[in-house]
Amino acid sequence: MAETKATLTNRLLAVKHNSGKSYSEIAEETGLTNVYVAQLFRRQAQLKPDTALKLRAVLPELSDELLGEMMRPPMRSYDPNLIQEPSVYRLNEAVMHFGESIKEIINEEFGDGIMSAIDFYCSVDKVKGVDGKDRVVVTFDGKYLPYSEQKTEHMVSRLRQNGN
């Protein structure tokens, strides 16, 4: 019987927990962002073969079976109840509150388009504010993707239908 995503995720998180290492420590040792490392352990990202060797060196408890599962394309999904978790709720609230302004600035700086969440890097960092208190820095670093003008002459499917 196939293992569920939740069961596999729990096994992966147990390996991380047993290592005593944080996502940021694993990230530093593998050359990945801390959020990407968390995505790997939550089966939201695919582990690439060259990175698998680095991850195994950092976490020797990862079995060949677990590494193999991490290298399979994941089912990227989330629990809809996750929004009720306070940190996730506040992050969503911040994006929704600032979203329209961020969109306008993207349009001013780049033109009509979006920030990719595919060619995308994300990290979470801890810094001290000017008042000496801890602050959370969430960085979204995504490739700019312009919207295409939909000209029929560029529509490959239509070109093929017309014998071109």
UniProtKB/Swiss-Prot annotation:
It is an enzyme of class 4 (lyase). It comes from the Eukaryota. Disulfide bonds: none annotated. Pfam families: Cyanate_lyase. GO terms for biological process: cyanate metabolic process. The keyword Transcription regulation does not apply. The active site is at 90, 93, 116. InterPro entries: Cro/C1-type_HTH, Cyanase, Cyanate_lyase_C, Cyanate_lyase_C_sf, Lambda_DNA-bd_dom_sf. Its EC number is 4.2.1.104. Transmembrane segments: none annotated. Coiled coil: none annotated. One of its GO terms (molecular function) is DNA binding. HAMAP family: Cyanate_hydrat. Catalyzes the reaction of cyanate with bicarbonate to produce ammonia and carbon dioxide. Belongs to the cyanase family. This is Cyanate hydratase. It comes from Ricinus communis (Castor bean).
